Amino acid sequence: ITADKSDPNKLLARTCGLWSDQWYEEEWTETSIAWGDHFFRSTDGGENWTDITPGQQEGQYTDNHYFVSEPIDTNGYAWIYGKAVHWGSGILIDPRNSDKILMTSGNGVFACDNVWDEKGIQFYFDPAGIEEVVALDMVSVPGGSAYSAIGDYDGFIHTDVNEIPEQYQPNMGSTSAIAYCPQNPDVMIRIAKDQNDTAPGFYTLDGGKTWNKMANANGGRAAITQLEDGSYRFFKSAHENDKTSAVFYSDDLGQTWETCTGIPSAYGSKMTNMFIEPNKPNIVYAYVTYYNESWFYSKDKPDMSDAHYTLCVSTDYGKTFTGTDVAMYDQCDSAGRIAYLGEDNLIIGAGWYGMYSVTDNGKT
């Protein structure tokens, strides 16, 4: 709740964590309702309140009913369409202009320039470069753009740091991974963090111009390699919530999946990161974080057999793997990434146990 410093009878309040409806301009034709918080105003010191959330609180003007507030305006940020003002308790009156307010949200900042008008109040998205999004994965395609995987908002195609990025369409909610094929960067996949409503994942063969649905593709990380016959093999690892390091592959563009063999796992293991040698598509790396979370039933502290990083290498395009233990796993969950320094030259992290240089396709 906040007060207008120039008139303490004018108060604004908002909810935090309410799951209710907010309207966009196509509500009457496309049911464009977003679900989030409500905001209210009072002009009599809080004795009476008006719900000024778009789509709420009809007012009587002449012979017709009108909503007090207009539908939310995207303000040129197309990706925010259909998304709500939510997960935020901040509401601020501009001290230089009490007609203007700012509200924080889980996806950025919303503003209004005429909050005290009798009707026609207009809320609009106004992040100005500070969208609050969670990047779960990101790739930079050689000779192309950068592509992100974003929690809640799928992801974006980033072509210019000074321009608003384009969001993937169709949109599928929280995306955990984005990957491209190093032998043909036009081939890409993005996979859902959960089994989302739109699809568990999409693939493209034309650099993102069109996306096609995959089946049962949700998971943690992703990779692609090109087979000898020119077709593509997709990989996905289990999501961290599954507590397994398992890796799966698909030879039919993500419609069916088989389990890769040779990947060690126990209940409690973390999701596995994969990497393809660009000039040797048969060489697939899988960096495994093995963790048996039941160790405490039989010992005072875990040892190497319970918790370790293992680098697994495949020479048959990712069907079967052979693993080499690298170091003790110390529960630094971000240590499983693979950094590529050039052909047969990798760097892998092991938390408090340092970094390791890997050469000779994992032999050294």
What do the predicted segments below correspond to?
Residues 1-364:
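Extracellular glycan-interacting surfaces
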